[in-house]
Curated annotation (Swiss-Prot):
The keyword Lyase applies. Catalyzes the pyruvoyl-dependent decarboxylation of aspartate to produce beta-alanine. Pfam families: Asp_decarbox. The active site is at 25 (schiff-base intermediate with substrate), 58 (proton donor). Disulfide bonds: none annotated. Substrate binds at residues 57, 73-75. SUPFAM superfamilies: ADC-like. It comes from Geobacillus thermodenitrificans (strain NG80-2). This is Aspartate 1-decarboxylase.
Length: 127
């Protein structure tokens, strides 16, 4: 049996743009993607801390070092520039490998730079 587990998370990123006229997706700084192991076209869940919206889209790599987090297409209706979001990717992990699975979590600062990179979330973390 396989279980769906969190594979990577970008925590508390700040939306830099919302582009309604684009076809779809979320554009994310490629340096940040590399740090957590997310890739182009990967399906991700977006959680908006400001309004509680949760939705799925896919990744488009953005300019390295830019700190860009741009929601495109219909998803642009669910965020505003400056909103705090969480970007989560998941993986299907075989039951026998669950104990070895270590997701990567990037905790972002207010300028969309990685403040901390951790291999697992401690219980009762408040940021």
């Amino acid at each position: 049996m396989f279980r769906t587990l969190m594979n990577a998370k970008i925590h508390r990123a700040r939306v830099t743009e919302a582009n309604l006229d684009y076809v779809g997706s979320i554009t994310i700084d490629e340096d940040i993607l590399d740090a957590v192991g997310m890739v182009a076209n990967e399906k991700v869940q977006i959680v908006n801390n400001n309004n509680g919206a949760r939705f799925e889209t896919y990744i488009i790599p953005g300019e390295r070092g830019s700190g860009v987090f741009c929601l495109n297409g219909a998803a642009a209706r669910l965020v505003q520039k400056g909103d705090i979001i969480i970007v989560i990717s998941y993986a299907l992990v075989p039951e026998e490998k669950i104990a070895m699975h270590r997701p990567k979590v990037a905790i972002m600062d207010e300028n969309n730079r990685i403040a901390q990179l951790i291999a697992e979330e401690p219980a009762h973390t408040i940021l």
